[in-house]
Amino acid sequence: MRCPFCAAEETKVVDSRLAADGYQIRRRRECTSCKERFTTFESAELVVPYVIKNNGNRVPFDANKLRVSLSRALEKRPVSADDLEKAISKIIIQLQSTGEREVPSKLVGSLAMDALKQLDKVAYIRFASVYLSFDDIEEFTKEIEKLRE
């Protein structure tokens, strides 16, 4: 692997261990030329299915779009960035494990809601209000009652 500091082609692995989510290997590398150290992450490359939107369009799954949506719901909530990334990784793994080449956007939304329900109930309600298109306070109340059960 090329050194990101001096572009030398030879680096050596100094340390290797499983990353926190268990699906990646974290490696500390050292450049044999400039002696700088850097971290790399190695993971299996699995195909994430296309998403079939409500209008019938098919688009590639965009993890960043999911990250932005969940981050917006979690704004000013006591949830760490690490917990958010773990939730996103879990959603991606669930999508990959369907074995399907295409999944409906409703599945992605449902998985996102399940993840938020586990992370933070307030963020879940925020996300649900947009995702489920709440029209009035009654719909909010019904969803909150479901959470209490």
UniProtKB/Swiss-Prot annotation:
The keyword Nucleotide-binding applies. A zinc finger (unnamed) spans 3-34. Binds 1 zinc ion. Keywords: ATP-binding, DNA-binding, Metal-binding, Nucleotide-binding, Repressor, Transcription, Transcription regulation, Zinc, Zinc-finger. It comes from the Bacteria. Its cofactor is Zn(2+). The keyword Nucleus does not apply. GO terms for molecular function: ATP binding; DNA binding; zinc ion binding. Residues 49-139 form the ATP-cone domain. Belongs to the NrdR family. Negatively regulates transcription of bacterial ribonucleotide reductase nrd genes and operons by binding to NrdR-boxes. This is Transcriptional repressor NrdR. The gene is nrdR.
